[in-house]
Structure formats: structure tokens, C-alpha cells
């Protein structure tokens, strides 16, 4: 009998083991769809980004008008740009839900997968930041100025690092050119990291909602989950196209319709919505270095999740107290996101400070204590 090419060919064999014959727990819910959705987001962003890069000019005098030209004169340029801009938002929605799933169901106990995932998040954040600077509108320019300036809080070498990153003494042409180069490069780095992420995941196999070992009961990925993922793709691409076609500027800042002007500061400098929670934490500390450290900690704290897991059960499925804390944490993140979009004045300052304190308290203190308490209650 002729050998099955899918199982014998060196390249097809890898695809087969990752996407076709992959043994998968039969009870994974729709929360496990977000990994593949992130893959679709990345593919969409790289394709639309490539098409946009063909019409973009990385020069301070031409960047703004080259984006306007793309939207007005290039065939479907407006659509490509709208999908790319809003695709970034969907990318972050998916990655935040994906991380939330990981925290709820204890997926962080696969340490290598979890750590590469956090590196992916950091790379995605860097990509989105440098990408936001490229249209060279007011918020692009001032966002770049404010965020890069944070590095000057690093003692002794800070100012040198900032000027080195800028390529001068302010955000100018060299900054824009290098940000374009980085924005082109980083998505491919994300793609590479994704392969590492998947390699680690396939070492252990997927977690499942019960948090128990499912080696005795697995089903092939195709056709069961390939079909389920296809449904997920449609359910994500539908709102994405709806947003891109009907309300493409809903999530953007009106300030970015004004070309960058170093002499006029916008009344409220704020990042895109997906960075607002971290921005609120940054602003809640009235000291530059302290704020920068809190900003870094707000994301890097995820690295500690495996160490802070004190429960004998893996998931929160059967732990009502931890569930309550988890959902308070989610509500808290919404509050931080809202506060980040408000001006720095009373009552937003105190709300932001309380929400920031609550964020770190829940993750560092309350969740581990609750895990240990639940062990005690269940006589573990």
C-alpha cells in the first residue's frame, strides 16, 4: 500500500501533527477558539499591512498625505486601511480574552507556553505602538513623544536611551523612519514566536475546562475543531468588517485627523483604548520612575501567575471564591480603561489610584490567599 503523503512527507507531516491529527481534549469550549483567532488576526494584519506599506512614505513631510492618498486614490485603499486599523483592536480583544481564559482555567501552569505567550503580548504591544505613530497625526506624534520619554526615567542612562531611540533631540524624521522599519519587522517576529508558542503547547497538549488530564480521551483536531474554528473566524470577521465599513473611526482619536505639529499640544494625550488600563496605572503614581515601574509591572506581573498558584485544583471552574475575585479583577480592568481615557482631575485621579491598587492586590495577594483558603475548606 502506498504511504500516506500527509503522514510521510517531512513538511506535510508537521502540518498534519499540528492541524489535522492533533489529539485534542473533546470538552474544550469556545474559550479555546481565541488562539486560532489570533492567528487569523496576524495573517489579516500582515496582508493588509503589506498592501498599505506599498503606498506609504516614511517621511515627516509626506507620511500624513501618503495615508490620505491611500484612502482616496488607491483601489479599496480606504477599506485596507480601515481593516488594518480596526484589525489591531480585534487583535487586542482576542489576546486579552485569550489571557483571561488562561488565568481562569489555570493554563499558566504550562510555564513555557505561558511565558512565550507573554513575550508575544509584549511584542504585539510594541508593534501596535510603533504602528500608531506612522500616520503622523497629532496623537501619533504626541503619543510617540510621551511614551518614548518614559525611558528617560531610567536612572543614569535614561536620557541617552531616549535620544538614541529618537535619532536626535526630539521625535522627528529619523524616529518615523525607524518606527516604520520596526513596524514592518515585528509582525514577522510575532509569527516566529507563535511557532515557538505552539511547539511548547503541543509538547503538553491543550488544557481543558475541567483542568484534569485528558490523555485517556482525545479526538482529532480535524474535522471537529477545524470546523469549530471556522465558525469562530466568521463570528470575528463579521464584526470586524461591520466596524471597518460602517464606523471605521469609532475607536480612533479625532485628534489624529490633524497633521503632526510639534508646536501645538493636544488637550488630552491618550493612547488607543487597548493601552488605557496600563496608562491609567502609569498616571496613578505621581512620580515618573514609580509610574514607569508600575506600568511595566502591570503586564510583567503575568510572569508570576504560575508561582502564585496555591490551589490544588487547576481551574477556577469549581472555586466560587476565586471566581468572584477573577470577575472583580475584570471589572477593575474596565474601570482602569475608562479612567485612562479621562482627564487628570478629581475624581478620576483617586478612582485610578484605587483601581490600580486593587489590580495588584487581587493578583499578588488575594488570589493566592483564596486558593489556599479553598484548599483548607475542601480538606485538601
Curated annotation (Swiss-Prot):
Alphabetic keyword roster: Electron transport, Heme, Iron, Membrane, Metal-binding, Mitochondrion, Mitochondrion inner membrane, Respiratory chain, Transmembrane, Transmembrane helix, Transport, Ubiquinone
Binding, a ubiquinone: 202
Keyword Mitochondrion: yes
Residues annotated for heme b b566 binding in this entry: 98, 197
Cofactor needs: heme b
Cofactor: how bound: Binds 2 heme b groups non-covalently.
Membrane topology term: Multi-pass membrane protein
UniProt record, GO biological process: mitochondrial electron transport, ubiquinol to cytochrome c
PROSITE patterns for the chain: CYTB_CTER, CYTB_NTER
Transmembrane segments: 34-54, 78-99, 114-134, 179-199, 227-247, 289-309, 321-341, 348-368
Residues reported in the UniProt entry to bind heme b b562: 84, 183
GO MF annotation terms: metal ion binding; ubiquinol-cytochrome-c reductase activity
Pfam families: Cytochrom_B_C (PF00032), Cytochrome_B (PF00033)
Gene3D superfamilies: Cytochrome Bc1 Complex, Chain C
Any one cellular-component term (Gene Ontology): mitochondrial inner membrane
Location of this chain's protein in the cell: Mitochondrion inner membrane
Database matches in PANTHER family: CYTOCHROME B
Role, per record: Component of the ubiquinol-cytochrome c reductase complex (complex III or cytochrome b-c1 complex) that is part of the mitochondrial respiratory chain. The b-c1 complex mediates electron transfer from ubiquinol to cytochrome c. Contributes to the generation of a proton gradient across the mitochondrial membrane that is then used for ATP synthesis.
Record note on quaternary structure: The cytochrome bc1 complex contains 11 subunits: 3 respiratory subunits (MT-CYB, CYC1 and UQCRFS1), 2 core proteins (UQCRC1 and UQCRC2) and 6 low-molecular weight proteins (UQCRH/QCR6, UQCRB/QCR7, UQCRQ/QCR8, UQCR10/QCR9, UQCR11/QCR10 and a cleavage product of UQCRFS1). This cytochrome bc1 complex then forms a dimer.
Note: Heme 1 (or BL or b562) is low-potential and absorbs at about 562 nm, and heme 2 (or BH or b566) is high-potential and absorbs at about 566 nm.
Family: Belongs to the cytochrome b family.
Protein name: Cytochrome b
Protein's organism: Fregetta tropica (Black-bellied storm-petrel)
